[in-house]
Each structure stands twice: as structure tokens, then as C-alpha cells.
């Protein structure tokens, strides 16, 4: 866990940006999340006020793993 924490902190310092996704519906939030990733943002926070937030996080985490991306996603 310390290694992951250190990696996330290094990534934050390097890029200076966290993409925060908050929307009123799950489908739009998923589209926005993917667009943010495609734009090169590597740390993402999905707001828990977004409907389906946990599903979005789970789906994006699977995509990150399948594509072996250096992207971090979590809840906020």
C-alpha cells in the first residue's frame, strides 16, 4: 500500500492535476471519465454524488488494468 501511495503522490506532483467527475447520470459521467483519461489525466476522482459512481469506478478500474495504463481512479 505504501508503494501505491508513493506512486500516486509522485504522479500528482508530476502532473499537478486531478480529474474530478461529477454528473447527474451514470452514462454521461462514464463518457466524461473516458474523455478525461483520453486527454492524458492520470488521476481521477469520481464523486460519490454521481449516480452509479461505484459502477463507474469498477468499470474504469477494469479498463485501466486490461490496457495496463498508469492511471489511478478513486472515490471522492
Residue ranges of model-derived segments:
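Conserved N-terminal beta1-alpha1 strand-loop-helix module at the mouth
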Residues: 1-74
Amino acid at each position: 500500500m505504501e508503494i501505491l501511495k508513493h506512486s500516486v503522490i509522485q504522479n500528482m506532483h508530476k502532473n499537478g492535476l486531478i480529474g474530478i467527475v461529477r454528473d447527474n447520470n451514470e452514462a454521461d459521467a462514464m463518457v466524461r471519465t473516458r474523455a478525461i483519461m483520453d486527454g492524458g489525466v492520470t488521476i481521477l476522482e469520481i464523486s460519490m454524488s454521481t449516480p452509479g459512481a461505484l459502477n463507474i469506478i469498477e468499470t474504469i478500474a477494469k479498463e485501466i488494468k486490461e490496457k495496463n495504463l498508469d492511471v489511478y481512479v478513486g472515490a471522492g
